[in-house]
Swiss-Prot record:
InterPro entries: KsgA/Erm (IPR001737), rRNA_Ade_diMease-like_C (IPR023165), rRNA_Ade_Mease_Trfase_CS (IPR020596), rRNA_Ade_methylase_Trfase_N (IPR020598), rRNA_adenine_dimethylase (IPR011530), SAM-dependent_MTases_sf (IPR029063). Belongs to the class I-like SAM-binding methyltransferase superfamily. rRNA adenine N(6)-methyltransferase family. RsmA subfamily. It is an enzyme of class 2 (transferase). Gene3D superfamilies: Ribosomal RNA adenine dimethylase-like, domain 2, Vaccinia Virus protein VP39. It is found in: Cytoplasm. Specifically dimethylates two adjacent adenosines (A1518 and A1519) in the loop of a conserved hairpin near the 3'-end of 16S rRNA in the 30S particle. May play a critical role in biogenesis of 30S subunits. SMART domains: rADc. Its EC number is 2.1.1.182. This is Ribosomal RNA small subunit methyltransferase A. It catalyses: adenosine(1518)/adenosine(1519) in 16S rRNA + 4 S-adenosyl-L-methionine = N(6)-dimethyladenosine(1518)/N(6)-dimethyladenosine(1519) in 16S rRNA + 4 S-adenosyl-L-homocysteine + 4 H(+). The keyword Transmembrane does not apply. The gene is rsmA.
Length: 256
């Protein structure tokens, strides 16, 4: 199919067979898996997944691609295509033990990752191709430059595994940046205390609002220096020096 990639959907189509096989190996799909693909595009992953699965749900916003995907011989009786924007979908409607995969468009990857956290109880694992810089941010440890809001929120909910890099040559058209594959596995038993996710997101967003300022400055009016000291958290540190566990502690304190 000749399809001109649409800039507004951030479309870059995966074409490299070796990379496709490596992604499939990482996902390891089994016939009865409850699998959902976000943004199947021209079906580079969709088609080999359909060969291994009894059924696949896919969410695609582009009408041209919707028509193309439903006409594929391998799709017949197996592909459940949802014509929608993934940011508007209730993922829990597809049942428990959901395995989510996708080559996420760069322009919506961060909001979509945060959005998916709302449905974390319905998800077994997620495998995504993202801009390499985004995967580095997700996997970053505190005290590093890449560590930020995305690192804290995703690491609070999931075990993060940075799997491998994907060069621009694997796509058509070639993106200007490298990509990478990440595996996110929601915790069965969390290493962190349970806390209100909204409170955690709010405190993390405020803490990272101005990265060069100290935690005390960024959280002025929310928590005092003496209260931070009582929690054993150094208010003189910058937000990227505060661990996920410490942000959880802060959210818990504010919730009470």
């Amino acid at each position: 199919m000749r399809h001109s990639p649409r800039k507004r959907f951030g479309q870059n189509f995966l074409q490299d067979k070796y990379i496709i096989n490596e992604i499939l190996r990482a996902i390891n799909p089994l016939a009865d898996d409850n699998m959902l693909e976000i943004g199947p595009g021209l079906g580079a992953l969709t088609q080999p997944l359909l060969q291994k699965l009894n059924r696949l749900t896919a969410i695609e916003i582009d009408t041209d691609l919707q028509n193309y995907l439903t006409r594929l011989p391998v799709s017949q009786g197996k592909l459940n295509l949802i014509p929608a924007d993934a940011l508007t979908v209730d993922f829990c409607q597809f049942g428990p033990h959901l395995r989510v995969v996708g080559n996420l468009p760069y322009n919506i990857s961060t909001p979509l990752l945060i959005y998916l956290l709302k449905f974390i109880t319905c998800i077994d694992d997620m495998h995504f191709m993202l801009q390499k810089e985004v995967v580095e941010r997700i996997a970053a440890t505190h005290g590093t430059k890449a560590y930020g809001r995305l690192s804290v929120m995703l690491q609070y909910h999931c075990e993060v595994e940075y799997l491998f890099d994907v060069p621009p040559e694997a796509f058509e058209p070639k993106p200007k940046v490298d990509s990478a594959i990440v595996r996110l596995t929601p915790y069965r038993v969390s290493p962190f205390e349970s806390v209100n996710t909204e409170k955690l997101e709010n405190i993390v967003a405020k803490a990272f609002a101005m990265r060069r300022k100290t935690l005390t400055n960024n959280l002025k009016g929310i928590i005092s220096l003496s209260q931070l000291n009582d929690l054993g958290i150094d208010g003189g540190k910058r937000p990227e020096q505060i661990s996920v566990a410490e942000y959880v502690q802060l959210a818990k304190f504010i919730s009470n």
